[in-house]
């Protein structure tokens, strides 16, 4: 017997990206190198983005990601982020999540010169990264959009029924999450 797996993070991120981004993106900073980052990186490769830098402090995840995706454009030290400019910054790490550390300060310093911010963290719904993006008038999307967009095809596959992401569903989920 064969077992097949599927991952809906790709779909969830693709829909989030397509709703937010309104112009050609050339330079991206992807923060994190775990499972969600892998799906996002695959989407970005499919979009033929010119430059993707991955910021991770985990040498093990760097090694795993570079081997599995044949990718080796990593930033390990946040000091390397100084004076960089990106069209899009994506936080695909657990940094900023409830009970976790925030991102490195050098990441926050990049926000005002960035066209778009996507933070896939959804608890709390407003992370420091999203707050800084809003204060800087940078178009952004928090993690709730991706959570709902990846949950939809997953639910449909498991229960063999179509659903829509209604305002009711969004507000029901929102009421369960924190806003810190």
Task: Please provide the spans of the model-predicted regions.
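Short helix-loop-beta connector
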Residues: 21-27, 112-113
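Glycine-rich adenosine-cofactor-binding loop
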Residues: 17, 26-45, 56-57
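Conserved S-adenosyl-L-methionine
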Residues: 46-51, 135-139
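Adenosine-phosphate binding glycine-rich loop
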Residues: 116, 120-180
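Glycine/small-residue-rich loop that forms an oxyanion/phosphate-binding "nest" at active or ligand-binding sites
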Residues: 1-24
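Rossmann-like adenosine-cofactor binding region
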Residues: 72-141
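Conserved hydrophobic helix-helix packing surfaces used for dimerization/oligomerization
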Residues: 28, 52, 115-117
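NAD(P)-binding Rossmann-fold cofactor-contacting core
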Residues: 49-69
